[in-house]
């Protein structure tokens, strides 16, 4: 019996046949108290003030109003940064998704029997996944300098970690019968994997990669804040100069671009599944 059940005794009911049934106390009150306590502690630590939020929150609507009508004259200067953002997203997603394949295979326990290798690869994927995209972009700018190269590397790292984790989990759920049959016929593990396992996971792998691409288009748009090029660079500039009408034009173009890419990605993923 758990400590909770010892403190809060279960209700006892005597059935018509004389048997005694127990109904355990609900854990909901305890969960609610813990959540409230953590919430109060968070408010105290962060200095959150709801009054300030209400008072200053109206400025958001002031900025929103300043964005419209947008500055259509600025549209011609948006296309190149938008193209840079899309290039970073596609190239970074492609590189990361391709690099994820061998690491996902090495992390799959039903393919690699060496538990040490599986543990090390999974640990590596977990460590890479903990790095925020902006931090990766910032590090990349110190290595490669300012520009889209840094943004592409940051997106590739994020995609690599995300797709790698998803893929090795998918590989571990496949039917291993064809793989074992290929090995019994004398095929190497690589041959057995490429002919018996990879075709099973390919549709899901492509679907996950496309889903990651959708998010990468949005992430790439803010990488310019750390000098990684793209729309984020001019967004940061317009916010700094308080040119909100031009910022509104940038956001509209970005919104349309993201919606188009998501629609195409969604259609492709439906065909794959």
Task: State the predicted function of each range.
Residues 79-87, 121-128, 210, 214, ...:
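Alpha-helical membrane-interface segments at transmembrane helix boundaries
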Residues 142, 217-254, 273:
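Glycine-rich helix-loop "coupling/hinge" segments at transmembrane-helix boundaries
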Residues 146-197, 203-212, 263-266:
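Membrane-cytosol interface at the C-terminal ends of specific transmembrane alpha-helices
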Residues 103-137, 166-169:
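Cytoplasmic-entry segments and transmembrane alpha-helices of multi-pass inner-membrane transporters
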Residues 210, 248-273:
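C-terminal transmembrane helix and the adjacent membrane-cytosol boundary/short C-terminal tail
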Residues 1-94, 101, 106:
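N-terminal, non-cleaved signal-anchor transmembrane helix
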Residues 125-159:
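Generic hydrophobic transmembrane alpha-helix motif, especially the helices
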């Amino acid at each position: 019996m758990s400590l909770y059940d010892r403190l809060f005794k279960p209700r006892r009911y005597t059935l018509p046949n004389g048997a005694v049934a127990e109904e355990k106390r609900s854990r909901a009150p305890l969960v609610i108290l813990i959540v409230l306590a953590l919430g109060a502690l968070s408010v105290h630590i962060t200095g959150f003030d709801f009054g300030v939020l209400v008072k200053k929150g109206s400025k958001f609507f002031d900025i929103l109003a300043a964005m419209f009508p947008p500055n259509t004259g600025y549209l011609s200067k948006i296309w190149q940064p938008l193209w840079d953002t899309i290039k970073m997203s596609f190239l970074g997603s492609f590189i990361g998704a391709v690099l994820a394949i061998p690491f996902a295979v090495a992390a799959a326990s039903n393919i690699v029997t060496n538990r040490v290798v599986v543990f090390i690869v999974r640990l590596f994927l977990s460590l890479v996944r903990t790095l925020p995209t902006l931090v990766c972009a910032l590090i990349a700018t110190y290595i490669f300098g300012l520009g889209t190269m840094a943004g592409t590397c940051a997106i590739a790292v994020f995609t690599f970690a995300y797709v790698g984790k998803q893929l090795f989990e998918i590989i571990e759920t496949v039917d291993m019968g064809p793989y074992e049959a290929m090995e019994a016929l004398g095929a190497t593990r690589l041959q057995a994997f490429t002919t018996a396992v990879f075709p099973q996971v390919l549709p899901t792998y492509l679907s996950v990669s496309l889903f990651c691409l959708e998010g990468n288009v949005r992430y790439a748009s803010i990488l310019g804040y750390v000098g990684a090029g793209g729309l984020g660079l001019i967004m940061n500039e317009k916010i700094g100069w308080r040119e909100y009408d031009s910022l509104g034009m940038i956001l509209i173009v970005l919104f349309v671009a993201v919606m188009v890419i998501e629609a195409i990605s969604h259609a492709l993923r439906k065909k794959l599944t």
